[in-house]
């Protein structure tokens, strides 16, 4: 079996590339996916978002090694093992990232990936329902909507931010990210709008696109040229050959693993596992980054939260309405208000993100408070901690060793203390007076730096945004894995295009920029002239040097 292009992974970037590479009908594309079909309400119902990430049917089941700086806790790292990849198990929050994120990419060696370069690709992929005119795309495959914000708590959160002196923004994906405002969702007609729904399924209707179910074991190389992929399907091993290129889009965990299994990575590490060296790229598996967050929870004195919907009868009613009409509480992820703010004067653009939720519960649906409540998920966006993904053995079936080194930099602790205290300030504003009860978590007794640090150590959680393990950069950067056209340095006919190529994590959730990578990489692969650069200038707070708000 062979095709012009062989893509490993049907996730956010892989699906976008399958769509774009096959669009003109000239080239054939094979997408290799080990995961299951994305069918059923557990995947497609937005409110069921906590289920698939806890199920081995849909998730690769990765976890970090015990993390020494958070008390030896091992944090789960869900990655989608399903059509659509992690876009089929994520929280459906859509964030492009801040313009300065991409300018930093370009300045660090990923030339051609500045905000002016990537903004046209965000517009090309979007079908925005209500975003800022002129800044948003309206004809792309990816539907993006705002929640209805029927619950008054969503408006209280935005008003509280305004009362605390922060900016308000109507579209954090438009000209102005900084501020409090509505959250955007990848939901369409009451269903999760994953990369599979947006890109892969339309692509599979074309005669030149084929989906192959199989476990990718390694890249097949002839000398220093990639010519195919060895896959395992059942008990059968076979090679799918690429006439033009192999493109890895297997996630920030599996992409570096696959490179190393194929002889591309740190020479000493590969030798340790008896793998023949093809290209010594010490950056493979390094530069691992993520977002961490804590949940600040408050009792609600009025019975208006989702706590009323957590009983079995209400869940059944919500499920039936969604199955019949795709409406009601099942048709939203319930993240409908958000904020991006700066932690202190001298910070040019937001470095703290908020997700607001009208219920007090863990992201994975566990440990719900036994009362009406609301919560903010809050965390710093630019941690200085860095981790790694390395091989456990040369066996492709073994999960890799994942070490995030969470909270290993002292600045992370100061940033999180500020996040906790800032959230208390926001919840203490007059807008919450009609609703505010006692603090559930951390609890009023947690006040000193040491007490807050203990709370963080015990309760900090991943936001599930791993990236950076196949860093994009200049060809003379020894830690770069791919060049600015996503080509693996030192190997021909092989590219990586997914969140693993991010030089630095972006300001927000990663599904949006991952799809953008797939869109832009497609033009590089096809040899097209990139879309014309934008001349639109993003809003930067004129007081950023003297004030945090």
Swiss-Prot record:
Catalytic residue list: 465 (proton acceptor)
Keyword Oxidoreductase: yes
EC number(s) reported in the record: 1.1.99.1, 1.2.1.8
Sequence positions that bind FAD: 4-33
UniProt keyword Ubl conjugation present: no
Keywords: FAD, Flavoprotein, NAD, Oxidoreductase
Necessary cofactors: FAD
Family under the similarity heading: Belongs to the GMC oxidoreductase family.
Described purpose of this protein according to its UniProt entry: Involved in the biosynthesis of the osmoprotectant glycine betaine. Catalyzes the oxidation of choline to betaine aldehyde and betaine aldehyde to glycine betaine at the same rate.
Name of this protein: Oxygen-dependent choline dehydrogenase
Organism: Brucella suis biovar 1 (strain 1330)
Lineage: Bacteria, Pseudomonadati, Pseudomonadota, Alphaproteobacteria, Hyphomicrobiales
Name of the gene: betA
């Amino acid at each position: 079996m062979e095709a012009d292009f062989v893509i490993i992974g049907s996730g956010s970037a892989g699906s976008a590339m399958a769509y774009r590479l096959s669009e003109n009908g000239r080239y054939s594309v094979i997408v290799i996916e080990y995961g299951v079909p994305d069918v059923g309400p557990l995947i497609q119902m937005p409110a069921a978002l906590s289920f698939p990430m806890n199920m081995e049917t849909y998730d690769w089941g990765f976890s970090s090694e015990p993390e020494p700086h958070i008390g030896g806790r091992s944090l789960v790292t869900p990655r989608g093992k399903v059509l659509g990849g992690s876009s089929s198990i994520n929280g459906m929050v859509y964030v492009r990232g801040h313009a300065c994120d991409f300018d930093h990419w370009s300045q660090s060696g990923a030339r051609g990936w500045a905000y002016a370069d990537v903004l046209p690709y965000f517009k090309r992929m979007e079908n925005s329902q209500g975003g800022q005119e002129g800044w948003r795309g309206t004809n792309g495959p990816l539907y993006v909507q705002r929640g209805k914000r029927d619950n008054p708590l969503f408006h209280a959160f935005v008003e509280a931010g305004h009362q605390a002196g922060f900016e308000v923004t109507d579209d954090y994906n438009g000209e102005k990210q900084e501020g409090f405002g509505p959250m955007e969702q990848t939901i369409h007609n009451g269903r999760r709008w994953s990369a599979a729904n947006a890109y892969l399924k339309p692509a599979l209707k074309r005669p030149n696109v084929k989906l192959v179910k199989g476990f990718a074991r390694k890249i097949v190389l002839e000398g220093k040229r990639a010519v195919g992929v060895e896959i395992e399907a059942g008990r059968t091993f076979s090679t799918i050959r690429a006439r033009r290129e192999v493109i890895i889009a297997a996630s920030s965990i599996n992409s570096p693993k696959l490179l190393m299994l194929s002889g591309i990575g740190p020479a000493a590490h590969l030798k340790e596992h008896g793998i023949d060296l093809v290209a010594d790229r010490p950056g493979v598996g390094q530069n691992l980054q993520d977002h961490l967050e804590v949940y600040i929870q408050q009792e609600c004195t009025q019975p208006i939260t989702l706590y009323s919907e957590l009983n079995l009868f209400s869940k059944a009613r919500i499920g039936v309405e969604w199955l019949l009409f795709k409406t009601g509480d099942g048709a939203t992820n319930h993240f409908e208000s958000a904020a991006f703010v700066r932690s202190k004067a001298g910070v040019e653009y937001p470095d703290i993100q908020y997700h607001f939720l009208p219920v007090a519960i863990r992201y994975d649906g566990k440990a719900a408070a036994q009362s009406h409540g609301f919560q903010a998920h809050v965390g710093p966006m630019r941690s200085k901690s860095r981790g790694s993904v390395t091989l456990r053995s040369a066996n492709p079936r073994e999960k890799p060793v994942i070490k995030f080194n969470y909270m290993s930099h002292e600045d992370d602790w100061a940033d999180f203390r500020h996040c906790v205290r800032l959230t208390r300030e926001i919840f203490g504003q007059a807008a919450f007076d009609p609703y505010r009860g006692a603090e559930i978590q951390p609890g009023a007794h947690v006040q000193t730096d040491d007490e807050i640090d203990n709370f963080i150590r015990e309760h900090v959680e991943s936001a599930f945004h791993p990236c950076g393990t196949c860093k994009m950069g200049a060809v003379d950067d020894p830690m770069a894995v791919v060049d600015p056209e996503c080509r693996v340095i030192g190997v021909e006919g092989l590219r990586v295009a997914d969140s693993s190529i991010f030089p630095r994590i972006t300001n927000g959730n990663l599904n949006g920029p991952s799809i953008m990578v797939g869109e832009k990489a497609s033009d590089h692969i096809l040899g097209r002239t990139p879309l014309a650069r934008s001349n639109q200038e993003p809003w930067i707070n004129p007081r950023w040097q003297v004030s945090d708000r």
